[in-house]
Amino acid sequence: MAEKLPRPTDAELEILTVLWSRGPTTVREVHDRICARKPTQYTTVLKTLQIMAEKGLVRRDEKQRAHIYQTARPREWTQRQLAGDLLQRAFNGSARSLLLGALSAQKASKEELSELHRLLEEYEKGTR
């Protein structure tokens, strides 16, 4: 059975997004990126990263004076886990309802719809 990490909070997901885009990063760099979008205290980012390390969401490298944080799992792994959790909790396991909900919540581009068609055909054929 696949390892299941705790579901990240909104604040943790925001930090994970920074780490996925930047790679291994210091608390200061994460704080600067988040502050570019909204005012946040440095100590809040630090404490959140410490909690995330305890939960297994990130790893901390303590070899340097400024600790370096990186995600414990790739973005795709976390997205799959979150999608599966949402599928069960909000859509009663119905992939159809999840997809329709996503498409009605935000308009998809023609390119995205073409890609979805292609992926669905691959799943139907069993090649994905």
Predicted regions located by residue number:
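Short, cationic-aromatic polyanion-contact patches
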Residues: 5-11, 63-82
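Glycine-centered, phosphate/nucleic-acid-interacting loop/turn motifs that mediate DNA/RNA or nucleotide
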Residues: 56
